[in-house]
């Protein structure tokens, strides 16, 4: 029997089969939309123009497969098509951009400085950011005191941005996408306070990022994944 693919149902079936076959050959990213670590992983994949199967999770109901491949239970988690699992957002960014880097985010001229900034973000700024955002869990200092501690890093970024459009020059680097989600989170604790601080260049940089087409794409909303769902290819 010959299948007439002009029939709409048959065409839909063919497209669905093709989508499943495509997803099977792709890496799989477990993600949570609002997590800054997951944001930068998605940005890395977008700038690398590297499609993956995306599985959005809920923190209260983590998929069994995700926990099986990454028992630590935090996102993002990327399982490469060959089965290798990458559990850290920074490593996911780097892996994606090592596959292809059309905009040279990992330019050797700025890579060392970019890595140093990301390290400072992850080890120092994130510490104060968590306490600023969740002051009720960290009562040793006031929220204002925690904010001022975090501002030490913002001052470094402001100084860099007085010279350049982006952190390390006039083009995007891995430092920008690796740090921006955390500055966004800091700003969102109290937007009025953030935009009253003496960091005009940083504020413009953040506003530009929030309007950036790839960031908007990175923040696309997806329904939480369940076993048996039709694959979601990201970017679609």
Q: What are these model-derived regions, one by one?
A:
Residues 57, 218-224:
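Acidic carboxylate-rich catalytic motifs and surrounding loops in phosphoryl-/glycosyl-chemistry enzymes
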Residues 3-151, 158:
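GST-like domain detector, emphasizing the conserved glutathione-binding G-site
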Residues 222-236:
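Acidic/histidine-enriched, glycine/proline-rich intrinsically disordered or flexible terminal extensions
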Residues 73-74, 185-189, 196, 230-234:
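Short alpha-helix boundary/capping motifs
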Residues 117, 121-211:
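GST-like fold's C-terminal all-alpha helical module
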Residues 212-216:
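A late-sequence structural motif
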């Amino acid at each position: 029997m010959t299948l007439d693919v002009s029939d709409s149902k048959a065409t839909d079936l063919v497209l669905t089969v093709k989508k499943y076959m495509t997803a099977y050959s792709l890496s799989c990213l477990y993600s949570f939309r609002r997590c800054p670590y997951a944001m930068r992983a998605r940005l890395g994949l977008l700038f690398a123009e590297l499609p993956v199967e995306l599985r959005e999770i809920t923190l209260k109901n983590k998929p069994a497969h995700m926990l099986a491949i990454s028992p630590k239970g935090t996102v993002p988690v990327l399982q490469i098509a060959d089965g290798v699992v990458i559990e850290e957002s920074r490593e996911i960014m780097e892996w994606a951009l090592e596959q292809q880097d059309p905009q040279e985010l990992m330019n050797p001229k700025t890579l060392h400085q970019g890595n140093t900034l990301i390290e400072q973000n992850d080890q120092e700024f994130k510490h104060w950011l968590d306490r600023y955002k969740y002051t009720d869990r960290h009562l040793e200092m006031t929220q204002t005191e925690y904010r001022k501690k975090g501002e030490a890093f913002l001052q470094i970024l402001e100084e860099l941005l007085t010279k350049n459009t982006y952190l390390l020059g006039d083009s995007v680097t891995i430092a920008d996408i690796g740090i921006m989600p955390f500055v966004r989170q800091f700003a969102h604790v109290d937007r009025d306070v953030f935009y009253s601080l003496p960091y005009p260049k940083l504020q413009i940089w953040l506003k530009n990022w929030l309007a950036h087409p790839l960031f908007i794409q990175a923040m696309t909303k997806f329904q939480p994944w369940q076993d048996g769902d039709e694959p979601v290819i990201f970017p679609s």
